């Protein structure tokens, strides 16, 4: 089993040139995505002109086929009552994504994937 606690997946956020490439794309699917993000962001503190929200699921999907660019450790973990992911030697061991070795490479990969034509 492989998991990505919030500690490592909370970095799945696009900003700067990566985000602007998505935001300014003429792709109909990305335009629809950005239209929906603009609507959603009205009820939040997010500024849709500047950055995405945290894209938690993108890291989980990435981990479904590779652990490249991630620091992985086989360990037992648990979630405390306060919602903190903590090591637990008595818990079932799993491969845990703890950190990134090259976060910018992931951001570039995610940007490239989103800008790629949809395969039908």
Segments and roles (model prediction):
Residues 1-120:
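N-terminal acidic, glycine/proline-rich low-complexity segments
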């Amino acid at each position: 089993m492989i998991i990505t606690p919030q500690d490592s997946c909370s970095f799945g956020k696009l900003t700067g040139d990566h985000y602007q490439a998505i935001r300014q794309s003429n792709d109909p699917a990305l335009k629809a995505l950005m239209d929906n993000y603009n609507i959603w962001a009205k009820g939040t503190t997010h500024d849709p002109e500047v950055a995405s929200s945290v894209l938690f699921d993108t890291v989980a999907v990435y981990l479904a086929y590779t652990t490249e660019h991630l620091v992985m450790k086989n360990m037992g973990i648990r979630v405390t009552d306060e919602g903190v992911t903590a090591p637990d030697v008595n818990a079932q061991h799993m491969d845990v994504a703890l950190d990134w070795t090259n976060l910018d490479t992931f951001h570039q990969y995610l940007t490239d994937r989103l800008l790629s034509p949809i395969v039908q």
